[in-house]
């Protein structure tokens, strides 16, 4: 779960690493936070893609059904 605090902490560690540098503990913490963050983002993307995939499938079935019901009248 990505929390506001987690984001703030990642930002804080990033800026500190750019300015004065991090201690070994902070480097470890930064690595853990980033892994957690990336894992969460990947999960979200996967869920998004799955819901989009299912939505598309049902739309296609819908579309195909409608085509069967249309009778083309030739003049």
Swiss-Prot record:
Identification of the protein by name: UPF0291 protein Teth39_0326
UniProt source species: Thermoanaerobacter pseudethanolicus (strain ATCC 33223 / 39E) (Clostridium thermohydrosulfuricum)
Intracellular or extracellular location(s): Cytoplasm
Taxonomic lineage: Bacteria, Bacillati, Bacillota, Clostridia, Thermoanaerobacterales
Pfam families membership: DUF896
Keyword Ion transport: no
Major localization listed first in the record, in broad terms: cytoplasm
Keyword Cytoplasm (UniProt): yes
Family affiliation: Belongs to the UPF0291 family.
